[in-house]
Structures are given as C-alpha cells and as structure tokens.
Amino acid sequence: MVNIHEGDKFVVSDVELDGNYLGREEEFKSLVKIRPGQPYNADQVAETTKAFSDHFSNFGFAFARVEAVPEIDREKNLVKFVLQAEPSRRAYVRRIHIEGNDRTRDEVIRREFRQFESSWYDGDKIKLSRDRVDRLGFFTEVDVDTQEIPGSPDQVDLVVRVKEKPTGAVTLGAGFSSAEKVSLSFGIKQENAFGSGNYLGLDINTSKYNRTLVLSTTDPYFTQDGISRTIDAFYRTSRPYSGDVYVDDQVVKADQLYKIVSKGASVRFGVPFSEIDTVYFGAGFEQTKIDRGVYMPRQYEALAGKSNTAIPLTLGWGRDSRDSALAPNSGRYQRVNAELSPAGDLKYVKATYQFQQYVPVTKAVTFAFNTELGWGKGLGGNAYPIFKNFYAGGLGSVRGFEQGSLGPRATEYIGPNGSIEKYSGGSYSYLGGNKKAVMNFELIAPFPGAGNDKTLRWFTFVDVGTIYGDKEQTRGLGVINADGMRASAGIGLSWISPLGPLRLAWANPIRKQPGDELQKLQFQIGTAF
C-alpha cells in the first residue's frame, strides 16, 4: 500500500524578475502567468518560463536560461517566485536542413520559410515558418528543431522534419441501376503534383444523369513573389431525376428528361499582401443551356431552350492564421468573395463569406466554429439565375438532412404538352435559394487509442442553417417556401485517408420542417467541415 499526503496548499505571494532582461522588463512582465494571491500552480510556472524563453528567442537568444526560483514561507504557507534569466549568447542560423520530404521538393518547403540562413535566430519567424509549411496541407507532422554547432557557440542549425501524407488520389467507380445499366466515374487529384506544390485535378463522370468533365490547376507560386494562379475548365450535364419516370403509364428514357448543360472556364490570381492575407481577382466565361424535357420545374421555363451566357468577374480577400491546414488546433480562417456578371445574358451579383475559428480547449481537444453566408441578386430588374442558387443540407453544411435539400421546393413541372403538372407521391424538386446561412460548432478530440495522431479524430457537433429563396423565382410558381431554420446535433469520425479527408457523421435533427428529407447517417470523402 502507498500512502500519499498532499501537504499544505501554498499561495503565491509575489513574483520578481532578476537577471538580464535586455532592458525589456515590462515586455517580460506581461508574459507572467503566475498570479499573486492565487494558489500555486505548476502549469502556470512552466508556461511562464517557456514564454520567457520564447520571447528571448525573438531577439536571437536561442539558448536563454530561465529559472523560476521559489522562496517558501512555510509558517504562512506562502511562496514567492524569483524569475532568474540569463540570455546567454546571441546566435544566427547557419543552415536549414529538411528531412522526411521523399516526394516534396526542398524548394516547396524553403519558400515558405521566413527565417533565413545567415540571419539572426528569430523565434517568431521560425514559428511562422513552421505554420506556413503546415498550412500547405502536404504533411501530417511538421517539427523544427534547433541544434547547436560544436565549436561555434554563436551558430545554430535548424532541422525541419516533415511526415508526408498522400496528396494524390485516383478514384474509379462503377454503378448499376435498372434505369441506366452501367455508369462509370473516374477522378484523379494531385495536390502536390510531382512534388512541385502545384495542384492538378481531373474529374470525369459518365452517368447519363450527371455527366461531368472538370479540369483544374493551381500554381501557388506563379511568380517568385508568391502570386498564385488558378485555371478551371468544366463541362457538366445534369438531369436531376435518376429513377424511373412515367408519363401516361409509359417509362420516360433518360435522354427525354430535361437537362441543364453548363460549360465554361475561368482564371483567378491571388496576391499576398501580408503573411496571412491574400487578395484574389479573376474573370471567367460561362454558358448554360436548359433543354426542355419531362419533369422540368416551372422555375426553369423562362430560361429554357436557349443558351444563357455570363461573364463573371471575381474579387475576394482571404486571411489564414491557422496553425495547420490538415488538423487545425488554433487560429482563424476568413474568406470573402464577390462575383459580378455585368455583361452577357445573365446579369447578377453574388457574394459569399466564410469564417472559421479554432480554440484549443486542452492540449488534445479543440473547439471549432464555422459559419458560411451567401447572398445573390439579379441586376437590371432580372431575377437571380436559378442555377446560381445556394444549397445547404448534408455533410459540409447541416448534417442529418439530405444533401442540398434545405430551402424552397418546386411542386409543379412543365408537362409534355406544356401543361402544368404536380409531382406525384409528394415528391419535390429542390431549388435552393439566393440567400444562405449556415453555422457549425464542433468539439474535436483524438480518437481513443490513436495517441497524438491528427489523421484520426472524433467529434461532436451542432449544426444550424437555412436557405431563403428569391421571391422573383418563387412567386406564383408552385413553390413551397420551406425556408425556416434547421438544426441538428450528433457525433462523427474524421480520417485523413489515402483517398482524401473522410468524414462519417450520425446526426439527429432537433429542428426540422414538414416534408424534410432526413439522412441521419452520412458519409463523404473530401469535405472539410
């Protein structure tokens, strides 16, 4: 048997600074976590000495010695701390070595560093450099160690150790149904193409109902100053109904259903103006055609049968201070984007805003908050284009509801002879809306038994969101304006798999509307929130 006696509780009576503080005593005093009048706390003492050492490193003192010396008054159960500091010698960085990057080129990592070789050691710049490398999203672990140089007391080497994650994915899929027999899908994505740091993606889907061809490439260092360039080209054919459709007791073939054909291309540039801020601007050309067919919602009637062109101009701003793009524990992410189409057949303005905040609750547990807002409006007295609508519901927005199901729903469609018909069986066509509001709250922790592995974590969540429709799209056209707020709560699992971010969530809708389509268990690869 082991007997443990905790002893008396001591209270901090005072905190003093002693030693060489480079004439910056007030700066160091602001870093003290030990509070007089509060019970002694070993964690606060350790946090204070570490904060002092880190602050010394910002002035080139990589090996500063800081010690919290206690002076104990046992009669009064008081303890006074004297923080003794000796900066030691100032050092500069001789070399920066990189280890563990089997695929990624050295230059991809080095260009993110703000601590340079042959420069004074700077703790803030080293931390910023580590975070910038981590935000690339290519690595599961990024560590920077400081090593002394034997015989050179004023020099150090930095060793950057990274652990690479799979950044490429090839997906092959096949599906079978009575309606379309066999459909094939193919996708290839490389976030770090040939170790260059460039993104290259190709998606192909041969389904009769949703045919897609998308090519995208991003060069994050299109210029040596860090200006990025993204080029996208796409061709999509969408037929919303994938089940058997009957008209006059006769099955309608897939090629007889109405379809939306979209094609276009865009180019976008990103110009950094601080370490965490970037301005984006670009332009594109889009052409959308709605071919008449069976089951076309009435909302598409005004745009059917012709090609509708848009020339969207984009302008945006982004700020990213997260400590990691893969599994953030602290920091903030914000992005504002505006899209204006002043020319072409479709004239509209569209704006989106996203905000994320990550707060460490403990060393292992993180609180995460995400909000997404969207707004769109037609210009020149025109309605907002319906195929530019926002959607919500499902993973990535409000979990527990069918993907894209929130907001207005069409109950009527254009029949074969131009007549107005009702969808049978209480079914709807989801229309989306021109206004969007979604909020997500998550508490994230390591999966039991996974240790500090950031690639496997579990989370609890609460989601809230809604979609509002444009009155010009819905007035008198057989629409249910199911635009009330929805909410859900549940638990989930996230895994950074070789195929990409995988998320599995079980959600219980706690606020819903009549007619909502629920999906309590949802699974998807590629969603970030």
Model-derived regions: residue spans:
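Extracytoplasmic gating/loop element in the C-terminal half of outer-membrane beta-barrel translocons
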Residues: V156, T366-G469
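Gram-negative/organellar outer-membrane beta-barrel architecture
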Residues: L22, R103, S119-P328, R332-Y333, ...
